Amino acid sequence: MAEVLLFHHAMGLTKGIHTFADELRGGGHTVHVPDLFEGHSFTTIEDGMAYVKEIGFEEIMERGARVASELPREIVYAGFSLGVLAAQKLAQTREDARGALFFYSCVPTSMFGSPWPADLPVQIHGMDADPYFVDEGDIEAAHELVASANHAELFLYPGDQHYFADSSLSSYDAEATALLLQRVLEFLRQLDN
């Protein structure tokens, strides 16, 4: 079974993130869910991003790297939105990563100074009308990553919600999340083959 390091989004470590992690654990996987906000949580994306700007994006990624340094290198890095920054940087630059899962976000691989490891499997999930994912360049970065990697998939779901797989938020889409979880669990299962 896979070991997963899962980073939360800009609203913090919500109950919905824990629920998602529990779904992966139900598939037999080990899931680590660190709190990169050190106990802070927010009711809006804007408030969460204001906190991130206050402490700095680099600090968020560094907190993720510190957690990763205490875990095995052979791990799947996963992130929701803001958490994709730490997950993508670690997956792209740390040796022996097993895979990557990006939810609602993707950044250009050039941001981390190296190409995506061609044989590192990755899935990217987002809604096809999510203004954050579609209008802020994430979908283009996702298409570029998929084109450059040997084992990469981009899954688009109908809808305009950003945090659609967080069951504790009003943006939750149960149908899209069920399909996302099915795809993620299959991805993790295939890593063991």
Give a label for each model feature.
Residues 131-138:
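Conserved alpha/beta-hydrolase "acid-adjacent" motif
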Residues 151-193:
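C-terminal catalytic histidine-bearing segment of alpha/beta-hydrolase fold enzymes
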Residues 79-83, 87:
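Gly/Ala-rich beta-loop-alpha elbow adjacent to hydrolase catalytic centers
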Residues 124-126, 157:
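Short beta-strand/loop motif that positions the catalytic acidic residue
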Residues 71-80:
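Alpha/beta-hydrolase fold nucleophile elbow
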Residues 2-72, 164-165:
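Serine-hydrolase catalytic machinery in alpha/beta-hydrolase-like enzymes
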